[in-house]
Swiss-Prot record:
Compartment(s) where it occurs, according to its Swiss-Prot or TrEMBL record: Secreted
Free-text cofactor note: Binds 1 Ca(2+) ion.
Signal peptide (residue range): 1-16
Name used for this protein in its record: Acidic phospholipase A2 BpPLA2-TXI
Cited CDD domains: PLA2c (cd00125)
Alphabetic keyword roster: Calcium, Disulfide bond, Hydrolase, Lipid degradation, Lipid metabolism, Metal-binding, Secreted, Signal, Toxin
Residues given in the record as Ca(2+) binding sites: 45, 47, 64
Tissue distribution: Expressed by the venom gland.
Length: 139
């Protein structure tokens, strides 16, 4: 349990408000984003390079690309408002910046459950820097 707590504390600063994103993924996908996607493929988790390995990894690739287009706010720190309706993330709030962050995560949160059947356990903890030698796709 202590290891899990340490891991969570260390990861909070890696990809924005990870606790909030983890909660979103748990609600929508019904599984832990940290355990299932924290170091999955070439793009799920911190950083990324190479070609996405499957549909879930592509979702993370698109998520990373969209983060680069968020303007006038800090997607790595700002907290956004959302709700879940019938298994779909719905962004709320009046702050346009925070709404952009939510929409980036909304896309990924709504797509990951669709790819649960194609999740490849053999690319969990995929050493992207070693094996993803192909040039990265443009966003």
């Amino acid at each position: 349990m202590r290891t899990l707590w340490i891991m969570a504390v260390l990861l909070v600063g890696v990809e924005g408000n990870l606790v909030q994103f983890e909660t979103l993924i748990m609600k929508i996908a019904g599984r832990s984003g940290v355990w299932y996607y924290g170091s999955y493929g070439c793009y799920c988790g911190s950083g990324g390079q190479g070609r996405p390995q499957d549909a879930s990894d592509r979702c993370c690739f698109v998520h990373d690309c969209c983060y680069g287009k968020v303007t006038d706010c800090d997607p790595k720190a700002d907290v956004y408002t959302y709700s879940e309706e019938n298994g779909v993330v719905v962004c709320g709030g009046d702050d346009p910046c925070k709404k952009q962050i939510c929409e980036v995560r909304q896309g990924c949160g709504n797509l990951l459950p669709r790819h649960k059947d194609t999740y490849e356990h053999n690319i969990l903890v995929f050493p992207a820097k070693t094996f993803a030698k192909k040039e990265s796709e443009p966003c």
